[in-house]
Curated annotation (Swiss-Prot):
Gene3D superfamilies, per the entry: 2.40.40.20, 3.30.200.210, 3.40.50.740, Dimethylsulfoxide Reductase, domain 2
Cofactor detail note: Binds 1 [4Fe-4S] cluster. Binds 1 molybdenum-bis(molybdopterin guanine dinucleotide) (Mo-bis-MGD) cofactor per subunit.
Binding site for substrate: F795
Cofactor names: [4Fe-4S] cluster; Mo-bis(molybdopterin guanine dinucleotide)
HAMAP family xref list: Nitrate_reduct_NapA
Record organism: Aeromonas salmonicida (strain A449)
Entries under NCBIfam families matching the protein: NAPA (TIGR01706), PRK13532.1 (NF010055), TAT_signal_seq (TIGR01409)
Keyword Iron: yes
Name of the protein in question: Periplasmic nitrate reductase
Enzyme type, top EC level: oxidoreductase
Length: 829
């Protein structure tokens, strides 16, 4: 077969990805079929199923199966390339243990919490599920039911879930697994700017003079963006890359200034940089005077542990996010304590490296982009870390302009589009609205055509609190969708598993595979995956992308959207709402939650014939274009309020659009005149999320971690991902090539630490914390190179549950878990 130049370039990209992953190029190349004139394969576009980068892929289907994928050459995000995981997308749906029937724990044909899983029909599954939810609502009320959702939900799945829980069941006990990864970014954005999500976009990469990575291993976690950054760095000798982390990883290979710091001391480093800018008269006074204000945050705010935990009990201001106005002079005095000498000593980073970092930010001629992911966010002071990074960009005016700005990268395909924008958090509604604001609740009730007072004002249980409430018997009917929280959540032994197995609780898990979470449940519902349904994701740069259903799911598997809407038919309003609420809209009497929420004259207004895809199972089932109706109703929340989304049909034609989309035009840089339609002529910059248009510069101190090494537990443990696997490995470990490339988790350890324990590379060790232990093998070489005193272990391996070890400490403001810092000991097995 003769290859075109484009095919040749793609083959080379595949070979490069294969070399990184340690698999053979021919294996990959067999999965790369590119030309429809040479095959009978049908091609269509879809965003990648994995991380939050938002790469677009072309999906090839044949005979009812996805048989090939390739990078979309017309996609502005990835420009025809995929990472190693993306090249194997065609195989994620075809694991041998794919679930195709609901499975219920039973003994002698009846539900039994301690019984074995047995197949049941969908009607039987919904019968027992509705029985348990109704009984819980009747006995204990809405606060005893809950749902744990996902940043992998499609936009309309998350929206349908939010309506069912917050309006239908009248509970805010809905939270996404994005609580574990993006909540600190959300609260950081809201505190500083009054609006969520980055102001810049990926176009910054090609225009920046320097990049600073704070707790982000982009080389493995966001490899397509890393390839664009590498191209920028290697094609221009004046471009710099600075990398900060608690251990060396692959991103250090490109670093001009690599810094390994003691865990938690990034807070001090950030304050040092701000101090350097002030001391060296590098403040952009015109910007600061026009566009910022200064506030001092409350300190000693605790660690989000149970109130009875000794560490939490010592906190003077647990969970207090208040801040008081202060002057610039007072702010300058505050950060003056973070001088070069003391911060170098505290952090373990040399003075030379710290000063080089500070000089970069302070140089007015250098355009700088700061990137971060879980190193900042999974942090007991993650909100503070986000705020302190914004301080640096605000002090220098390097923000909301091409090539300069702070940028929080996301780890899931729709953590932004679904969890954040739709508002599937326990405290949120769509478009940055919150349940605690009566005006916001009134807006939602009006759009949803609901009686006043339907949506409760109480913030629901967040992710970590949900596990605690399950254990304590206060949350009894619980639905988990599109995540594997038993493996991914913290402190599995003490908090997660006891709650799932509590006899008072009924746990439902919707998943395509029998995950660790599914195996701990009472009822498992088999779900459709990725292009087996029509979907939409929102990526890290505010880009919303759509795709059509391209193949049918296995017979018996149903999408999360279908499950949510079909389950709603099981409830009459009289069974879930008080009589006084129904009396406000008597026409709702006798109707089901499906009628009220999804057949309300808005969601069901578009005929199913408008769907352009070859398949649309949900629309066929319900008789109207479900996805379009849900999206257009949802989009009402943000239009005219800085969260504008384009009309539904426009997204199917485009490779995504970055909101706000006004008059058909997307926005690349927010808050800047000439780019953002919400900034008027003459304003220059306006942070319109704040009433006065001014962003906040916060005075926030260094505070220690919730748990640190001591004499018995003498090492730091950090967890995370590797290139070849995604999160808990539910999909990637079922791809043979990816499994072979990295089959089992290992403990990355400094050679001298291993030697001191009498352990050689490849030997088994037992890693234990105050909460549990796991057995694994030691790796003293390779991609991750921890300093002495710290070990790193990925969490993708279901046979080595590293979250038996982790502490369920959270940022008290965002409630996001700190997976990067707990104390362990390592002994030879």
């Amino acid at each position: 077969m003769k290859l075109s130049r484009r095919d040749f370039m793609k083959a080379n990209a595949v070979a490069a990805a294969a070399a990184v992953a340690g698999v053979s190029a021919p294996t990959l190349a067999a999965n790369l079929i590119t030309s429809t004139d040479k095959t009978a394969i049908k091609w269509d576009k879809a965003p990648c199923r994995f991380c939050g980068t938002g790469c677009s892929v072309l999906v090839g289907s044949q005979d009812g199966r996805v048989v090939a994928t390739q990078g979309d050459p017309d996609a502005p995000v990835n420009r025809g390339l995929n990472c190693i995981k993306g090249y194997f997308l065609s195989k994620i749906m075809y694991g041998e243990d794919r679930l195709t029937q609901p499975m219920l724990r039973m003994t002698n044909g009846k539900f039994d919490k301690n019984g074995d899983f047995a197949p049941v029909s969908w009607d039987q599954a919904f019968d027992i599920m509705a029985e348990k939810f109704k009984a819980t609502l009747k006995e204990k009320g809405p606060t005893a039911v809950g749902m744990f959702g996902s940043g992998q939900w499609t936009v309309w799945e998350g929206y349908a879930a939010a309506k069912l829980m917050k309006a239908g069941f009248r509970t805010n006990n809905l939270d996404p697994n994005a609580r574990h990864c993006m909540a600190s970014a959300v609260v950081g954005f809201m505190r500083t700017f009054g609006m969520d999500e980055p102001m810049g976009c990926y176009d910054d990469i090609e225009q920046a003079d320097a990049f600073v990575l704070w707790g982000s291993n982009m080389a493995e976690m966001h490899p397509i963006l890393w390839s664009r950054m590498s191209d920028r760095r290697l094609s221009n000798p004046d471009v710099q890359v600075h990398v900060l982390s608690t251990f060396e990883h692959r991103s250090f290979e490109l670093a001009d200034n690599g810094m390994v710091f003691t865990p938690q001391t990034d807070l001090a480093i950030l304050n040092y940089v701000a101090n350097y800018i002030i001391q060296n008269d590098k403040v952009n006074w015109e910007f600061v005077n026009k566009h910022t204000q200064f506030r001092k945050g409350t300190t000693d705010i605790g660690y989000g542990l149970r109130p009875t935990h000794p560490t939490e009990a010592r906190a003077k201001n647990p969970g207090n996010g208040d801040a008081t106005p202060m002057s610039f002079d007072d702010f300058a005095k505050f950060v003056a304590d973070y001088d070069l000498e003391s911060v170098s000593k505290l952090s373990g980073v040399s003075k030379e490296k710290l000063e080089k970092l500070a000089q970069l930010y302070a140089d007015p001629s250098k355009k700088v982009v700061s990137y971060w992911t879980m190193g900042f966010n999974q942090h007991t002071r993650g909100v503070w870390a986000n705020n302190l990074c914004y301080n640096i960009h605000l002090l220098t005016g390097k923000i909301s302009t091409p090539g300069s700005g702070p940028f929080s990268l996301t780890g899931q395909p729709s953590a932004c589009g679904t969890a954040r924008e739709v508002g599937t958090f326990a405290h949120r509604l769509p478009a940055d609205m919150v349940v605690t604001d009566p005006k916001h609740r009134a807006i939602a009730e009006k759009i949803w055509k609901l009686p006043e007072g339907t949506i409760p004002e109480q913030v629901g249980y967040h992710a970590v609190l949900q596990n605690r409430m399950l254990k304590d018997g206060k949350l009894n009917a619980y639905w988990v969708m599109c995540n594997n929280n038993m493996q991914a959540g913290p402190n599995m032994n003490e908090e997660a598993l006891p709650g799932y197995r509590n006899p008072a609780n009924f746990i439902v898990v919707s998943d395509p595979y029998p995950t660790v979470t599914a195996q701990a449940a009472d009822l498992i519902l088999p779900t459709a995956m990725w292009v087996e349904k029509e979907g939409a994701y929102g990526n890290a740069e505010r880009r919303t992308q759509f795709w059509h259903q391209q193949v049918k799911p296995p017979e018996g598997a149903k999408s999360d959207l279908w499950q949510l809407m079909e389950f709603a038919k099981r409830f009459k309003v009289e069974e879930v709402w008080p009589a006084e609420l129904i009396a406000k809209q008597p026409e709702l009497k006798g109707k089901t939650l499906f009628d009220v929420l999804y057949a309300n004259g808005q969601v069901d207004q578009f005929p199913k014939e408008q769907s352009k895809g070859e398949f649309n199972d949900e629309s066929e089932s319900f008789g109207f274009y479900v996805q379009k109706g849900l999206f257009e109703e949802y989009a009402t929340f943000g239009r005219g309020h800085g969260h504008d989304l384009a009309p539904f049909d426009q997204y199917h034609e485009a490779r995504g659009l970055r909101w706000p989309v006004v008059d058909g035009k997307e926005t690349l840089w927010r808050y800047r005149e000439g780019f953002d339609p919400y900034v008027k002529a003459g304003e220059g910059v306006r942070f319109y999320g704040k009433p006065d248009g001014r962003a906040v510069i916060f005075a926030l101190p260094y505070e220690p971690a919730a748990e640190a090494p001591d004499k018995e537990y003498d090492m730091w443990l950090s967890t995370g991902r590797v290139l070849e696997h995604w999160h808990t490995g539910t999909m990637t470990r079922r791809v043979p090539e990816l499994y072979r490339a990295f089959p089992d988790a290992v403990l990355f350890m400094h050679p001298e630490d291993a030697k001191a324990r009498g352990v050689r590379r490849g030997e088994e060790v037992i890693v234990s914390s105050r909460r549990g232990e796991v057995k694994t093998r030691v790796e003293t070489r390779g991609r991750n190179r921890p300093p002495k005193g710290l070990v790193f272990m990925p969490f993708f391996d279901a046979s080595q549950l590293v979250n038996k070890l982790t502490l369920d400490a959270t940022d008290p403001l965002s409630k996001e878990t700190d997976y990067k810092k707990c104390a362990v000991k390592v002994v030879k097995a």
